Design a protein with these regions (language model features):
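N-terminal Rossmann NAD(P)H-binding glycine-rich loop of SDR-like oxidoreductase domains
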Residues: 16-34
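Rossmann-fold cofactor-recognition segment
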Residues: 57-70
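NAD(P)H-binding glycine-rich loop region in Rossmannoid oxidoreductase-like domains
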Residues: 68-110
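Catalytic helix-loop patch of NAD(P)-dependent Rossmann-fold dehydrogenases
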Residues: 105-114, 137-180, 184-185
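NAD(P)-dependent short-chain dehydrogenase/reductase
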Residues: 168-229
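Substrate-binding strand-loop-helix patch
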Residues: 188, 213-222, 242-260, 319
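Mid/C-terminal beta-alpha module of Rossmann-like enzyme folds, strongest
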Residues: 233-287
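Amphipathic terminal alpha-helices
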Residues: 303, 311-326
């Protein structure tokens, strides 16, 4: 069980409405709010809370079922609850599926229209809004880290375009907003790259992993702390937030995952049983949705505005592997 230790400095009356609490990030944001004594209310599309039943605070906190694509329902729910802040974690995140012709309208309805619905409701009650976005709003070319206030948008795929549309909906509707771009997300409550690698590593003796896509992982437990730090302030704007520890490839990440797993006693991932080979994106084969090569996000604005950076991704991975069963 995680131990939450915070120096409480917030408004005990702050009410925060969190979307997407069945997912990795929404789950952790709710727990962080509880740890700081804030009033957190979660929502997702399921009739009841359907995230990890792990006994943490989120499983017992108030929950409202809401379809964010239903404009009237969003307005009614948010104006009745009157939260001080809405942290919008809900999104369509299946990047390849988003390319299917029969899915595109739904993806846009969730990521763009749903976000507009929430922004409009926030404007009505003068609430702050946090919108979680992605490096996929850029074209992923070059090697220079993307700056949070860069406007050279050029999404490579449907998912990226709809997340950009969501960003613009927030920025064009509100003044009190935090748009936070993240990359390579992992958390306890949901599917992610680490869990996938641990699973395939058990059943294969050789894996090939892409080595020419570069970025940095983001642990939702660490990110949730930063997001709650943010809503305690009025330092609005665009931010980039991943863990520290440098820029790496998916191949580098995989090697470290298995190295740390072995250190924890999982010898099935040792190099004498499991070989991991680097390949280029071209060699790996075409995925339905194009992926950015350059997912480097510059995070210096966080420190400039007085926010505490996230721990290193290596440290985050170490803590994460001790949280999950594999």
């Amino acid at each position: 069980m995680r131990v939450y230790e915070y120096l409480y400095k917030g408004d005990p009356k702050m009410k925060v409405f969190v979307t997407g609490v069945a997912g990795q990030l929404g789950h952790d944001v709710m727990n962080d709010l509880a740890a700081r004594g804030y009033e957190g209310i979660g929502t997702d599309i399921a009739p009841q809370y359907s995230g990890a039943d792990d006994g943490t605070a989120v499983t017992k906190m108030p929950y409202v079922s809401l379809d964010i694509t239903d404009r009237d329902a969003v307005e009614k729910t948010i104006t009745e609850l009157k939260p001080d802040v809405v942290v919008h974690c809900a999104a369509w995140t299946a990047v390849d599926l988003a390319e299917d012709d029969d899915k595109k309208a739904k993806v846009h309805a969730i990521n763009a229209d749903g976000t507009q619905n929430i922004a409009d409701a926030c404007k009505k009650i003068d609430a702050k809004m946090v919108y979680i976005s992605t490096d996929y709003v850029f074209d992923g070319q070059g090697t220079t880290p993307w700056q949070p206030d860069c406007k050279d948008y050029a999404p490579l795929n449907v998912y990226g375009q709809t997340k950009l549309d969501g960003e613009l909906a927030v920025a064009n509707t509100l003044e009190k907003y935090f748009i936070v771009r993240i990359a390579w997300v992992f958390g306890v409550n949901g599917k992610n790259f680490i869990k996938t690698m641990l699973n395939v590593g058990k059943t294969h003796d050789k894996l090939t992993v892409v080595s020419d896509q570069i970025g940095t992982p983001t642990y939702t437990l660490d990110l949730s702390r930063l997001l709650v730090d943010m809503i305690e302030t009025d330092k609005y704007g665009y931010y980039h937030a991943t863990n520290e520890g440098g820029y790496i490839s998916w191949y580098d990440f995989t090697k470290e995952i298995f190295k740390q797993a072995v250190e924890l006693g999982h010898t099935e991932y040792s190099e004498d049983r499991l070989t991991v080979a680097p390949v280029t994106t071209a060699e790996y084969g075409v995925s339905k949705a194009a992926r950015p090569f350059n997912s480097r996000l510059d995070k210096s604005k966080l420190v400039e505005n007085g926010f505490k950076p996230l721990p290193t991704w290596q440290d985050a991975l170490h803590r994460y592997l001790q949280e999950i069963e594999f």
